């Protein structure tokens, strides 16, 4: 069943009040793959604006792959993996500041919190302060992942979602409208999987998030929604309780 046919269906989660939105660095880069493309940045900003106008408490975790890909270039540069990971974390700070500037130009109060202390440009990550910002209607952008090497920003997003008691973790994808049984960009017969539980996600090795992030969500029962960030209105529809993309959660009561 296509996304348009499912658009009017109600999600079993219902309306969501507080969420963490995971944005990849690549979503800000456009077709070039690197750097920050103004048009791509504006797409994310428009979605966030709709979420804020809908009254949601929104936190964002942004990746840094458009700035620096530590895992890919560590060997080429002859540097340790831990150092490369710290360099990647700094890339997420660049993206977070770009998002903050773009949102505040549109009148959205925004705070950047970094797991690595960079007090000149971002607040340190403090859980209670982050929650207070959300309660006051500010968008909070979490930078630097977990602040530790060897952990992805997906894991950082899962961790922050649990820490701030989010209703769900929203995994934004580019031109992929959910979870597929195989890569739809390679296989023309790929089929979307609209609903699955954590064990299915982990056992089938579906390319949604890394294993550590999925295990964190599974252990605490945090719902995961995978959706296309480039389709206008998707984020707002999710927050309003519509079924969009694919849902990963506990086993449904009826199989």
Curated annotation (Swiss-Prot):
Q: How is its activity regulated?
A: Allosterically activated by GTP. Inhibited by UTP.
Where does it live in the cell? Cytoplasm
Please give the pathway this protein is involved in.
Pyrimidine metabolism; CTP biosynthesis via de novo pathway; UDP from UMP (UMPK route): step 1/1
One matching Pfam family: AA_kinase
Q: Where is this region: Involved in allosteric activation by GTP?
A: 30-35
Q: What is its EC number?
A: 2.7.4.22
Q: Which controlled-vocabulary keywords does the entry list?
A: Allosteric enzyme, ATP-binding, Cytoplasm, Kinase, Nucleotide-binding, Pyrimidine biosynthesis, Transferase
Record carries keyword Transferase: yes
Describe the reaction catalysed, as an equation.
UMP + ATP = UDP + ADP
Function of the molecule: Catalyzes the reversible phosphorylation of UMP to UDP.
| HAMAP family in the cross-refs | PyrH_B (MF_01220_B)
- Report the sequence similarity comment from the record: Belongs to the UMP kinase family.
Subunit-level organization: Homohexamer.
- Protein name (database record): Uridylate kinase
In its UniProt entry, the species of origin is given as: Rubrobacter xylanophilus (strain DSM 9941 / JCM 11954 / NBRC 16129 / PRD-1)
């Amino acid at each position: 069943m296509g996304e348009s046919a499912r658009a009017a269906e109600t999600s079993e989660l219902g309306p969501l009040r507080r969420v963490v939105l995971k944005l990849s660095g690549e979503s800000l880069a456009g077709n070039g793959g690197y750097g920050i493309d103004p048009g791509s940045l504006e797409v994310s900003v428009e979605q966030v604006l709709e979420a804020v106008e809908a009254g949601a408490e929104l936190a964002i975790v942004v990746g840094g792959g458009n700035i620096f890909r530590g895992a890919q270039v560590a060997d080429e540069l002859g540097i340790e993996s831990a150092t490369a990971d710290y360099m990647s974390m700094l890339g997420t700070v660049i993206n977070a500041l770009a998002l903050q500037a773009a949102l505040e130009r549109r009148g959205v109060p925004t705070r950047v919190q970094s797991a690595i202390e960079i007090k000149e440009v971002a607040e340190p990550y403090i859980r209670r302060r982050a929650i207070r910002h959300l309660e006051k209607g500010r968008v909070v952008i979490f930078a630097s992942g977990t602040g530790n090497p060897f952990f992805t920003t997906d894991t950082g997003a899962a961790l922050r979602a649990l820490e701030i008691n989010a209703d769900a973790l929203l995994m934004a994808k580019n031109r992929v409208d959910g979870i597929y049984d195989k890569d739809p960009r390679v296989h023309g017969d790929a089929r979307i999987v609209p609903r699955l539980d954590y064990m299915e996600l982990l056992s089938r090795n579906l390319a949604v998030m890394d294993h550590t992030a999925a295990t964190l969500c599974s252990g605490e029962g945090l719902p995961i929604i995978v959706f296309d960030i480039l389709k206008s209105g998707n984020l707002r529809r999710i927050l309003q309780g519509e079924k969009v993309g694919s849902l990963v959660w506990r086993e449904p009561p009826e199989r």
